[in-house]
């Protein structure tokens, strides 16, 4: 999985219902034409990452088609999901609060 660009934003929780902080990632991917995920428009991931104290975890993610925002009915492989979680753990602190 090759991430070509990304954005990260802190998700405001004005009522502080959830513990910790949540961050939304939008990650553009470069997908090989032979891959099942490939679409001519391109693919991006919308991921939510949670940080509570020293602990961080990937809460959820969706694979979407660029341009249409159509939800793709695929899951990442375990290795790719770990790679996504690691990427988020390294970049969540770039969000402005």
What are these model-derived regions, one by one?
Residues 1-17:
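Short amphipathic beta-strand and strand-loop transition segments with alternating hydrophobic
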Residues 3-5, 39-46:
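Short, mixed-charge, low-aromatic patches
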Residues 46-97:
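Acidic, low-complexity intrinsically disordered segments
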Residues 21-31, 45:
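A short beta-strand signature
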Residues 15, 30-43:
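Short, cysteine-centered beta-strand-loop-beta hairpins and adjacent loop/turn segments enriched
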Residues 9-11, 28-30, 64:
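A structural detector for beta-sheet-dominated domains
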Residues 19-21, 41-43, 55:
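A short, structural micro-pattern
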């Amino acid at each position: 999985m090759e991430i070509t660009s990304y954005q990260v934003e802190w998700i405001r929780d004005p009522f502080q219902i959830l513990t910790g902080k949540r961050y939304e990632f939008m990650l553009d991917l470069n997908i090989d034409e032979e891959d099942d995920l490939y679409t001519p428009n391109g693919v991006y991931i919308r991921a939510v990452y949670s940080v509570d104290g020293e602990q961080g975890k990937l809460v959820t993610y969706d694979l979407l088609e660029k341009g249409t925002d159509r939800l793709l009915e695929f899951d990442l492989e375990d290795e790719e999901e770990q790679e996504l979680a690691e990427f988020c753990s390294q970049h969540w602190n770039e969000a402005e609060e």
